[in-house]
Amino acid sequence: MNRENKQQQVAELHEKLKRAKAVFLADFRGMSVEQATTLRNELRAAAVEYKVAKNTLLELASKETDKESLSPHYAGPTAIAFSYDDPVAAAKVLSKFAKTQANTFKLKAAVLSGKQISVSDIQALADLPSREVLLAKLLGTINAPVANFVGVLAAVPGSFVRALNAIKIQKEGN
């Protein structure tokens, strides 16, 4: 690879590192082409970009970004996954794959919102419900007091109408 190609790759990686909400590093030593293709397809479905890059290029590209703390992990074969939207989805796919392919694929570290997280933190992130489920729970929590208040307001006239109806039935019976 000539110098111009390397500079272009560094610039491209730098832009992706700056844009990504979360970046995950993994060691893919011993992975077969079939396994790599499966992982790429699963990550693509989760809107995650997956690349294999030279460690020296990653080192240069991560300078002056909030992902610079990953530098000590640029050793051995390094794959990098960029999540631009939902870091939880990326963590789920990568953690699941790391469990099923424990001999050939190991997570190294990640950066989420500018803070480095460990492999155990990645697993904890993967155990979270999806963004949609969390939003639904939040909306349910916000909506519950309003729904209860409406129920209380509707109960007062309802009980009054039932009381009047009971009086009417009682008078008709006499």
UniProtKB/Swiss-Prot annotation:
Gene3D superfamilies: 3.30.70.1730, 6.10.250.290
InterPro entries: Ribosomal_uL10 (IPR001790), Ribosomal_uL10-like_sf (IPR043141), Ribosomal_uL10_bac (IPR022973), Ribosomal_uL10_bac_type (IPR047865), Ribosomal_uL10_CS_bac (IPR002363)
GO molecular function, one term: structural constituent of ribosome
Coiled coil: none
A matching Pfam family: Ribosomal_L10
UniProt-listed SUPFAM superfamilies: Ribosomal protein L10-like (SSF160369)
Superkingdom of this protein's organism: Bacteria
Keywords: Ribonucleoprotein, Ribosomal protein, RNA-binding, rRNA-binding
PROSITE patterns, per database record: RIBOSOMAL_L10
GO cellular component annotations of the record: large ribosomal subunit
The keyword rRNA-binding belongs to this UniProt entry's keyword annotation: yes
One GO biological process term: translation
HAMAP family assigned to the protein according to its UniProt record, in alphabetical order: Ribosomal_uL10
Assembly behavior: Part of the ribosomal stalk of the 50S ribosomal subunit. The N-terminus interacts with L11 and the large rRNA to form the base of the stalk. The C-terminus forms an elongated spine to which L12 dimers bind in a sequential fashion forming a multimeric L10(L12)X complex.
Role noted for this protein: Forms part of the ribosomal stalk, playing a central role in the interaction of the ribosome with GTP-bound translation factors.
Protein's UniProt name: Large ribosomal subunit protein uL10
Record organism: Geobacter metallireducens (strain ATCC 53774 / DSM 7210 / GS-15)
